[in-house]
Amino acid sequence: MALAQKVASRPAVASRRGVVVVRASVESRRAVLGGLLASTVVALTSANKAQAAATPVDLFDDRKVRETGFDLIYEARDLDLRQSARDGLDQARGSIDATIKRVKESETRIDADLEGFIKKNYWTEAREQLRRQVGTLRFDLNTLASAKGVKAEKKKALELKKEFIQKVEDLDFALREKDETSALKKLEAAKSALDSVLAYVL
């Protein structure tokens, strides 16, 4: 009983939490609703402008490109299709005119660029240019050799190509050794080997 009286006689402790009272007036409600309405109107107007500025879908006729096999790598795997066709090697070998054009372009770059790079001692650029051109020349010379009808002519063309590749490997070694005089000599040997193989296959 005494405990109950002590508890009852204690003064009530005021809560430490503050109470926030918000009273919205009619004017503030109207301002909020007016702002909401204005932003909605602006959003709808900009959406209409964007739709008006949109162009129609452009349609392209890619049937010619698809016939050449451009999109084969994006299609599901066709097990009847050879890997060389999927990689584009058959398409590259299909046109002899395009192959001749690539070979002449490679010859021009070898004749024009390599000597300047070697004389300036730009070894990395010389090696990269040589390897870029020979990378396609290997396959293109094989294509031109296989276009020869007679087996003996084909064999002779492949022998000349093999000699050219050997001269290129010697030149590449001289470029890696950074020997200017040796590289210039081997460049001339590689050029003459390329000229002889091209004279035979073209």
Curated annotation (Swiss-Prot):
GO terms for molecular function: calcium ion binding; electron transporter, transferring electrons within the cyclic electron transport pathway of photosynthesis activity. It is found in: Plastid, Chloroplast thylakoid membrane. Residues 1-54 form a transit peptide. GO terms for cellular component: chloroplast thylakoid membrane; extrinsic component of membrane; photosystem II oxygen evolving complex. Belongs to the PsbQ family. Its main location: plastid. GO terms for biological process: photosynthetic electron transport chain. It comes from the Eukaryota. Keywords: Chloroplast, Membrane, Photosynthesis, Photosystem II, Plastid, Thylakoid, Transit peptide. InterPro entries: PsbQ-like_dom_sf, PSII_PsbQ, PSII_PsbQ_pln. This is Oxygen-evolving enhancer protein 3, chloroplastic.
